[in-house]
């Protein structure tokens, strides 16, 4: 049997893109209304981490969740926002499950993400989460790089929106090497936009990174699901090659996945 020369197969984002941008905002404060409108204007998508059990005077009422967060993701932030590293593990489980149930009852879809409240977590909590139906969890802190995470249960963002946002955004849009996958992940709280200058900074960022053909705009869970689907693909050892120097796309029946061979 004659074997073909090995071919290069890359995991790409939808449409063959090699960059993804995602946002993550906590606590469901009233300022989310303006932030969501800004994201929607520039085609940017993100995840909003809500607490089902906290008083609502300064938070988005449940009656607005479905419409406001349409096109984005709602994820857990625990029911009461405790510092869970100080809590018994069984109580942490109850905090997560109660929040999931509350959010799912309103949103009507499985809620599978978490932002650790107060940035508080332990390895034992991270190990518990998959049994509670949680597929990823965001920690606090910034990497200021664009690498894909090695562990989605301790997912650290590129930057907080007050930490070098435009500088990191400019570096992100200038990335061009398509043999790598790049992710920019911005996190924060909408109540931190206290002045018009703060809002102007975020709009400047959205103008910079929005509407770019090389970038996929995704929620947190979409990235997690996509990478999991890609990892489950099976390939034969001998790949049939296309004509020399011709690029082809092979779509599978997995959501949004494409592979490219050369």
What label would you give each PLM region?
Residues 40-135, 141-159, 182-191:
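Metal-dependent polysaccharide deacetylase catalytic core of the NodB/CE4 family, i.e.
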Residues 1-31:
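Boundary/entry segment of secreted carbohydrate-active catalytic domains
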Residues 89-94, 163-166, 196-199, 203:
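Non-membrane alpha-helical structural segments and their capping/turn regions in soluble enzymes
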Residues 29, 162, 191-194:
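Short acidic, S/G/P-rich loop/turn micro-motifs used as interaction or catalytic elements
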Residues 25-28, 78, 190, 220:
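Active-site metal-binding loops of divalent metal-dependent hydrolases
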Residues 2-13, 41-43, 56, 104, ...:
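C-terminal domain-boundary segment and adjacent tail
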Residues 166-177:
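A short, acidic, amphipathic alpha-helical segment used as a generic capping/interface helix at domain edges
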Residues 22-23, 73, 215:
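Hydrophobic "anchor" residues on beta-strands that sit immediately upstream
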């Amino acid at each position: 049997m004659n074997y073909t020369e090995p071919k290069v197969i890359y995991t790409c984002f939808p449409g063959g893109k090699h960059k993804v941008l995602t946002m993550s905002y906590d606590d469901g404060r009233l300022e989310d209304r303006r932030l969501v409108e800004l994201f929607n204007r520039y085609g940017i998508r993100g995840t909003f981490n809500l607490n089902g059990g906290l008083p609502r005077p300064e938070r988005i009422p449940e009656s607005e969740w479905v419409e406001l967060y349409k096109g984005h993701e709602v994820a857990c932030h625990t029911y009461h926002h405790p510092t869970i590293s100080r809590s018994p593990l069984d109580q942490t489980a109850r905090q997560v499950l109660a929040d999931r149930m509350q959010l799912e009852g309103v949103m009507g879809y499985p809620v599978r993400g978490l932002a650790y409240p107060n940035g508080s977590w332990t390895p034992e909590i991270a190990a518990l989460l998959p049994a509670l139906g949680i597929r990823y969890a965001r920690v606090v802190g910034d990497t200021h790089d664009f690498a894909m995470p090695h562990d989605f249960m301790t997912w650290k963002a590129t930057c907080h929106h007050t930490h070098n946002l435009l500088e990191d955004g400019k570096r992100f849009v200038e990335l061009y090497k398509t043999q790598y996958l790049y992710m920019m992940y911005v996190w924060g709280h909408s109540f931190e936009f206290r002045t018009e200058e703060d809002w102007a900074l975020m709009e400047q960022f959205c103008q910079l990174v929005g509407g770019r053909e090389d970038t996929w705009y995704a929620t947190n869970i979409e990235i997690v699901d996509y990478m999991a689907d890609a990892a489950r693909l099976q390939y034969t050892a001998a790949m049939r090659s296309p004509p020399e120097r011709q690029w082809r796309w092979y779509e599978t029946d997995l959501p949004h996945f494409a592979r490219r061979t050369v």
